[in-house]
């Protein structure tokens, strides 16, 4: 039987069971099949690298690039100000590593959608591992370069409220690199803004800024980390 027919049939059944409460397991299985079609998997353990380097915001994603330093998008950081409290650690659960205050926000001076956020090292609310941000996360290293057809992964928090701040990983390939823009076909959704684009060595190539949420789309976009952008980020990493 055609796989698309099977998926659509199960999706219809899932809608029915969600209303009647007959079988919640069918809903979960349907979601798993749909995610498999998109090359998307849920991350079950965020305590290990690279997953412990990807942090959640209320409606987006960020990732750790150095001591007390997070990269996200300008369109994400614009909703925050110095002194705001964020759950900046893996999996979006404040009990996982504490809640932290923003110390500074530095937007890239060009048109590229990059923002560097520095946070206080000590949590204002304590998590089970203590107050220190850097004990709960691991920073990424920059990739030297990237090229078309390289395999990549995107890790983040798509549809965070709907998915209860669960972390997901999607895989794909680079389709185009032009100046500071990188296009790829890994599946993304709202909430993936600020996600790292990683190579096969889990080195960061760029930061996701937008997409069209379509399977196989080659128009999902990230800011490609050129030497100039890397220099800007490096200058804002806390020493």
Curated annotation (Swiss-Prot):
Q: Which residues form the active site?
A: 75 (charge relay system), 113 (charge relay system), 193 (charge relay system)
Pfam families recorded: Trypsin (PF00089)
The Swiss-Prot or TrEMBL record describes its family as follows:
Belongs to the peptidase S1B family.
Endpoints of the signal sequence: 1-36
> What is this protein called in UniProt?
Serine protease SplC
Top-level lineage group: Bacteria
Q: What is the main EC category here? A: hydrolase
Statement: the UniProt record of this protein carries the keyword Amino-acid biosynthesis: no
UniProt KW keywords = Hydrolase, Protease, Secreted, Serine protease, Signal
Mind listing the GO molecular function terms for this protein? serine-type endopeptidase activity
Localized where? Secreted
